[in-house]
Amino acid sequence: MATLLKPLRPVTTYRHRRIIPAPAAGFLILVSLLMPQAELLAADKLVVYSGRAERLIKPVFDAFTAKTGIQVDLLSSGTTELVNRLKAEGDRTPADLLLTNDAGSLELARGAGLLRPLNMREVERAIPSQFRAADNSWVGLSGRFWIIVYNTAMVKPDQLTSLLDLANPQWKDKLAIPNSGSEYLQAGVSVIRATHGDERTKKFLEGLRDNAGSQVYQKSSQIVDAVAKGQVAVGIVNHYYVYRHLATQPTAPLAVIMPDQKEGGMGAIMNVTGIGITKPSTHVENAKLLIEFLVAQAGQKMFADLDKEYPLHPEVKADPALVDRKSFRAAQVPLTRLAELREPTLTLIEQVGLR
């Protein structure tokens, strides 16, 4: 069974939770929070630093434990805090694997030398190359798309075709958006920057800021609730928040637009949940078994269905409630570029003054 340990304390208080360079992070080690040495030496146990909600990953790890007998200890915190913590702990980290909801954070961890390159045929057969690092030091597990959710009583679907449309004045006081600290917002803005350039992206962000006003939320589920209740007409969220809401409230007046699908459009913005083995791990073979379990068809199906995400294994079908993956295009900005795009994106977000 997956054991839920005390959540990690954040190791940074930066507004946008920037990744701290390794030398600076080294000063942040808190020895009292490290796992006991007996835990570190347990051959039948893995420690996973997870940026994913516990309820969405614990059942998968429980299934892995039932199959292999290997226990998984799950320590949860924000993705940026986890990467900074790995830097601070260095070779003394108890973590065997890092699991995050953002490819950019995984690529930053890879670039900082925190993850171990892998040679695994199971991974290369199961997960297409665009969803993993070139050296397999991180591997995508499931996909999510940044979409427009709208209230069907307030909006007609042909009123919106692009995310950029949401910056138009007609959506003044009708729009809800994530706050500026959202990893999803930061990754989405990075893709828009890479596609359209800084000038157009800045105008887009200024429009979002003005149109949303006070309708800025910490949780994407709050955005979906606001749209469902008619407090606003439209919002920007990852797709699965809408389908999760509809699973419990099927009559809610909600629908999804996969944006930017017109000819010449950038395509829907995609990110992945992914995992990598930490370089200092002493349980590499067991960690590989976990990754092998997660990329196999059964693991992919379970992992994706828990949160209405898109499996990355080409032979595993998504929940039929979701928009058919073959019916829309994804943006062409490589996931591995999200790391290099991040800092300039945060600077632009700050300049615009998003809340």
Description of each model-found segment:
Residues Y14, A22-P36:
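Bacterial N-terminal signal peptides
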Residues L40-V47, T65-T68, N168-Q170:
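Immediate post-signal peptide segment of exported/extracytoplasmic ligand-binding proteins
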Residues G51-K58, S77-E81, P94-V232, G264-M266:
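Extracytoplasmic ligand-binding site segments that recognize negatively charged/polar headgroups
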Residues G51-V72, H245:
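Short, polar/charged alpha-helical segment
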Residues G104-L108, A228, A233-L254:
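A ligand-binding cleft/hinge motif common to bilobed small-molecule-binding domains
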Residues I147-M154, M270-H283, M302-D305:
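A bilobed periplasmic-binding-protein/Venus flytrap-type ligand-binding module shared by bacterial periplasmic
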Residues D173-S180, F293-V316:
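Periplasmic-binding protein-like
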Residues E199-T201, E309-R355:
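An extracytoplasmic/periplasmic, membrane-proximal ligand-sensing/linker region
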